[in-house]
């Protein structure tokens, strides 16, 4: 019995010894898989949001979900909003919205807006719509771009992507959004 216990301990020790390099490699990433140097000038970053991250601005706007998409089940004069969470001073270059527009009559329009902290005023920065897209049940994309579209001033404004549904059902569905942006030099200089 002692021999079996000793043999079992030896086998366990060997297995642990073989597993340790594998476990430690989880923490040590090779240089090729690490994020690029944040101090690189002109580096373009991207932040991706799922459709489920859009929020109804009113409880009157009811909605359903399908996969990662969100769609209206009622159409009051209310909107879905995706609040942007990017660093102060970030320059938004492109906002790409992933959506489904399978309605032959109505187009979808999406807005990039700024608003004051008190939510008393807002301003439209850019708009994109689906008028140039074919009707399709497949996920498609529309984009707003500029050089930059906007430089974020989080001290005095909030920023969001806004969509006001005009029909109900999955023929119009938000699936996600991706923002491409650069960071200000002051953030890049941090250790």
Report each predicted region and the residues it spans.
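Glycan-recognition and processing domains
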Residues: 29-75, 189-191
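Extended, low-complexity, turn-rich repeat/linker tracts enriched in Gly/Pro/Ser/Thr and Asp/Glu
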Residues: 88-90, 99-109, 118-119, 167-171
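Extracellular carbohydrate recognition and processing domains
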Residues: 122-150
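Exposed low-complexity, polar/acidic, P/S/T/G-rich flexible segments that act as propeptides
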Residues: 166-191
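Noncatalytic modules at the cell exterior or secretory-pathway interfaces
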Residues: 147-169
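Sec-dependent, cleavable N-terminal signal peptides
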Residues: 1-31
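Short edge beta-strand/loop segments characteristic of extracellular beta-sandwich folds
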Residues: 83, 96-100
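Extended extracellular/luminal ectodomain segments enriched in beta-structured repeat modules
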Residues: 77, 86-94
